[in-house]
Amino acid sequence: MTSVKERVAAPSVNFEKILFFPEGIPGFEDFKEYRIFHKETNGLAIYWLESCDDAAVTFTLVAPDHYGLHYDFNLSDEEQTLLQAEEPMQLAIFLIVSKGEGQYAGLNANISGPIVINVQRQRALQKVLQQSRVLTTIIDQ
């Protein structure tokens, strides 16, 4: 079992390679390979995943610290094997962001389902957290 603590200085993601999700993303299990793209806007790094099989299947990602979140969770032995992770320092954590409608209008981050990427092996999974220790920092701007 590997303990994962999200760091401020996460390893950089190689945008020239394909990310492989061995089990897909929950709800999109048939889509296992994704290109990752990156854009910086107003100091915010935004990433998005695009399925190699269907360009209409995309996900927007941000680093958790954008929302003042810092993760501390354990990977199961199975998850560690899927990611081919040997050290926690190989892993980067991202959140899927979606645009809400109605009373939930605006951008919403899925904090209970972070994307965990082994940046050295270009393997990823969505970690569905049942219980987690998420430190939230409220920033007055």
Curated annotation (Swiss-Prot):
Pfam family, one: FliW
InterPro entries: Flagellar_assembly_factor_FliW, Flagellar_assmbl_FliW_dom_sf
Keyword Cytoplasm part of the UniProt annotation: yes
Keyword flag Cytoplasm: yes
Localization, UniProt: Cytoplasm
Chief subcellular location: cytoplasm
Gene Ontology biological process terms in this record: bacterial-type flagellum assembly; regulation of translation
One GO cellular component term noted in the UniProt record for this chain: cytoplasm
Key words of the record: Bacterial flagellum biogenesis, Chaperone, Cytoplasm, Translation regulation
Subunit structure as annotated in this protein's UniProt entry: Interacts with translational regulator CsrA and flagellin(s).
Summary of the function given for this chain in its UniProt record: Acts as an anti-CsrA protein, binds CsrA and prevents it from repressing translation of its target genes, one of which is flagellin. Binds to flagellin and participates in the assembly of the flagellum.
Recorded family membership: Belongs to the FliW family.
Name used for this protein in its record: Flagellar assembly factor FliW 1
Organism: Desulfotalea psychrophila (strain LSv54 / DSM 12343)
Lineage of the organism: Bacteria, Pseudomonadati, Thermodesulfobacteriota, Desulfobulbia, Desulfobulbales
